[in-house]
C-alpha cells in the first residue's frame, strides 16, 4: 500500500501547490501549461476513483460498453468518459456511469463484452492511444462480439473546401448552430468581422475543433487499424438508429464501421 499512498500524496502536492509555486500571472503560456497539468492530475484521480466500479464488473459477461459517451448515457450499458456531460446517475438496472480516462485502456476482463460502441470519440485521441484502445477492445470482446464506430467523415469537409461548396457550410451551420453558435461564433481568437469570410476557417473548425481533434480517420485507415489489432471482419456500415441515435448532425456527417471478433 505504500506506493499507492506515495502516489496519492504526490498528486495532491501537484494539484494543490503547483499554482502557488508558479507566478502564473506573469505569463499566459505558463498558465496554459499549468491548466494542462492540472487536467492530467484530475484524470489520474478519476482513474483511481473508477477502480471500484471496474472491479465490480470483472466477473461480468455480455457487457455493452459506450466509450466516450459524453451526455449520451445509455440505459443498461456501461457508459465511460472522462466527463459525463449530463450528470446522469445509475438508477436504471444494469446502467453504469464511469468517469475514466480511456487513454489508460479498459480495465476489464478479457472476453467480457458482447458489444462495444463509440461515436465521435476516437478522433479525440492521439493515434498511439487510439490503436491501444482498439487493441484492448478486441481483448475485451467475447468471440463473435461486435465493435461499432461512428466517426466524422472528414472527406465531406475536404470535398466541400476543394469544390468551394458554400451550401455545404451553410447547411452544417444551420444544424450545428445550437451547439456551436451561428457562423461558428466560437472560432477562438478570430475578430468578429472576419468570421465566415474564408472557407478555410470553417475547415479549421471541421478538422481541428479547437485542438480537440487529434487524429483524422477515414474508412481505409480505420479499417487497417482494426485489422492490425486482430479484428478479422471489418465492414462499412450505414446509420443505424437503434445504435447511432437520431441526432441530425451525426447522421449527415459520420461514417460507420463495425468489426467482429
How would you describe each model-predicted region?
Residues 1-65, 137, 232, 238, ...:
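Non-catalytic N-terminal targeting/anchoring module and adjacent flexible stem/linker
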Residues 29-36, 70-74, 212-218:
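Short low-complexity stretches enriched in small and charged residues
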Residues 36-39, 47-53, 69-70, 88-90, ...:
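N-terminal start-of-chain detector that recognizes signal peptides
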Residues 53-55, 68, 87-88, 106, ...:
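Short, flexible, glycine/charge-rich loop motifs used to bind or transfer phosphoryl groups or to couple energy/partner
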Residues 60-159, 220, 257-261:
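Conserved SAM-binding loop
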Residues 129-142, 146-260:
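S-adenosyl-L-methionine-dependent methyltransferase catalytic module, highlighting the catalytic core
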